[in-house]
């Protein structure tokens, strides 16, 4: 088994354990949605998840996807990313990281810059706020969109 598959399986097991601790029933559909989110690095919308899973789960609906995403978000295993009027996107990676977003196609790419972790501590120290989180986005044009323009 490849290291990536082992990692996906491990993260799936951890997510299922978190759901069980929260008293959430584990269904094949829930497992499939989580597995898709873990394996996908594209920050999919609920519709994209539906399109990917509906061939294997013909009875699944977009409403089912949204309901499960809401449960996952409330437990803390998924983050909802909202950008303007566009559909929400969902990110399995809930650790502090940042996003670069293409202004043309909406593609979102993760990146981590450790020095930015200090921003919360500094903001808390200077303002005396109890800082709970922060969000940073960088916008630009992705390579694929730049190549199309040329």
Swiss-Prot record:
Q: Which residues form the signal peptide?
A: none
Chief localisation class: cytoplasm
Functional note: Manganese-dependent repressor that controls a regulon of oxidative stress resistance and iron-storage proteins. May act as a hydrogen peroxide and organic hydroperoxide sensor.
Q: Work out whether the entry's keyword set contains Signal.
A: no
Protein source organism: Staphylococcus haemolyticus (strain JCSC1435)
Gene Ontology MF terms: DNA-binding transcription factor activity; transcription cis-regulatory region binding; zinc ion binding
Amino acids binding Zn(2+): 102, 105, 142, 145
Protein name per Swiss-Prot or TrEMBL: Peroxide-responsive repressor PerR
Q: Which Pfam families match?
A: FUR
Q: Which UniProt keywords apply?
A: Cytoplasm, DNA-binding, Manganese, Metal-binding, Repressor, Transcription, Transcription regulation, Zinc
Q: Where is this region: DNA-binding?
A: 1-84
Q: Name one GO biological process term.
A: negative regulation of DNA-templated transcription
Concerning its family, UniProt says: Belongs to the Fur family.
- Taxonomy of the source species: Bacteria, Bacillati, Bacillota, Bacilli, Bacillales
The record's subcellular locations are: Cytoplasm
């Amino acid at each position: 088994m490849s290291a990536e598959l082992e990692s996906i399986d491990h993260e799936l097991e951890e997510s299922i354990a978190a759901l069980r601790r929260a008293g959430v029933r584990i269904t094949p559909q829930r497992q499939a949605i989580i597995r898709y989110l873990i394996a996908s690095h594209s920050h999919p919308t609920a519709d994209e998840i539906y399109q990917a899973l509906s061939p294997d789960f013909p009875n699944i609906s977009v409403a089912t996807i949204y309901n499960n995403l809401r449960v996952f978000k409330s437990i803390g295993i998924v983050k909802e990313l909202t950008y303007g009027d566009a559909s929400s996107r969902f990110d399995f990676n809930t650790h502090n990281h940042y996003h670069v977003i293409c202004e043309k196609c909406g593609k979102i790419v993760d990146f981590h810059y450790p020095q930015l972790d200090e921003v919360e501590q500094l903001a808390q120290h200077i303002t005396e706020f109890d800082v709970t989180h922060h969000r940073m986005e960088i916008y630009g044009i992705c390579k694929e969109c730049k190549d199309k323009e040329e």
